[in-house]
Design a protein with these regions (language model features):
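Beta1-alpha1 glycine-rich phosphate/pyrophosphate-binding loop at the start
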Residues: 2-76, 162-188
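Conserved N-terminal glycine/acidic-rich loop preference
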Residues: 11, 19, 38-57, 109-114, ...
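FAD-binding core/adjacent interface of flavoenzyme oxidoreductases
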Residues: 1-10, 72-149, 237-239
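Preference for well-ordered, secondary-structure-rich cores of eukaryotic proteins
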Residues: 32-35, 74, 125-130, 174-175, ...
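A conserved short coil-to-beta-strand element within the FAD-binding core of flavoproteins
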Residues: 79-90, 207-220
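Short acidic, glycine-rich loop/turn motifs
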Residues: 94-100, 224-227, 265
């Protein structure tokens, strides 16, 4: 298909995070691409530990205005939230911060709206100033805390524990993991290595502590464990892998029981 032919077709991408931006930069060479983003920046979900412990560094590399990407120059970006997808008419209804509605037609739809995961990823409609305010609030929570608890021993939890302890050696940083060692599923040498690193940095590791998750998860106060034990901290970081998909705008027929999009192995919608 020629470039001119494909440019007559429109691809709408819902979600301009890491995946949405990457897809948009590739497809804009051949299609009219419209991106829908709840934030005017690419606010990456990567490196939470550095974000909390060294926000100025993190902002330089992981908080980038979408208008700053040259490869998105041909992409029409709507700072809005998707409210409804109508598959019959091939349209997406979006609402911006002024509560103005826009109906956007598409030939192809890419769903890259992501998930909520802990307190640092959400689908709230925010301006650049509101993004900066939220990032600073999260960093200040850690900065002002005397005791920090990280629940979950995966890569995110380990990164948070190490970065926070290195930035604030005076703080008591505790890592709670359900297994014997952090990083379940990783090579045993890697698990042993990071266990030694955490210990050397002064992180208190509590193995065999599976937390009882609450809704909403507390950001401070008491953590309760299945064993009946409990712990108290000034700041709590939940990195247990619980995710909530941002898919309320999609027809129920496209979703599984947990709200995730049902797809084939090719990531096409079933």
């Amino acid at each position: 298909m020629s470039r001119r032919q494909t440019k007559d077709q429109t691809v709408v991408i819902i979600g301009m995070g890491d995946t949405g931006v990457l897809v948009a930069t590739r497809l804009s060479r051949y299609f009219n691409v419209i991106g829908i983003s709840t934030k005017p920046n690419l606010v990456s979900g990567q490196e939470l530990g550095k974000r909390l412990a060294d926000l100025s560094w993190w902002n330089r590399y992981y908080n980038t205005p979408l208008r700053g990407f040259k490869a998105l120059a041909d992409v029409e970006i709507h700072h809005a939230k998707a409210e409804c997808v109508d598959l019959a008419t091939k349209t997406v209804l979006v609402v911006d911060q002024s509560n103005d509605e826009t109906l956007i037609p598409f030939d192809f739809l890419v769903i890259a709206s992501g998930t909520s995961n802990g307190f640092w990823r959400d689908d709230h409609l925010r301006s650049e100033a509101q993004i900066d305010e939220r990032l600073e609030q999260d960093a200040a929570t850690i900065r002002d805390a005397n005791t920090v608890a990280i629940v979950g021993g995966g890569p995110c939890g380990v990164s948070c524990a190490l970065n926070i302890r290195r930035a604030y050696p005076e703080k008591m940083v505790s890592l709670y993991t359900s297994g014997d060692l952090p990083l379940p599923g990783y090579h045993d040498e890697a698990r042993q290595y990071y266990h030694r690193e955490l210990t050397a940095e002064g992180v208190q590791i509590f193995s065999g502590h599976r937390a009882i998750t609450e809704e909403p998860s507390p950001s401070a106060g008491t953590i309760r464990f299945e064993s009946g034990q409990s712990a108290v901290a000034d700041a709590i970081i939940w990195s247990t892998g619980n995710r909530k998909p941002h898919t309320r705008f999609l027809p129920d027929a496209l979703l599984d029981d947990e709200g995730f999009v049902k797809t084939k192995n090719t990531l096409e919608v079933v």
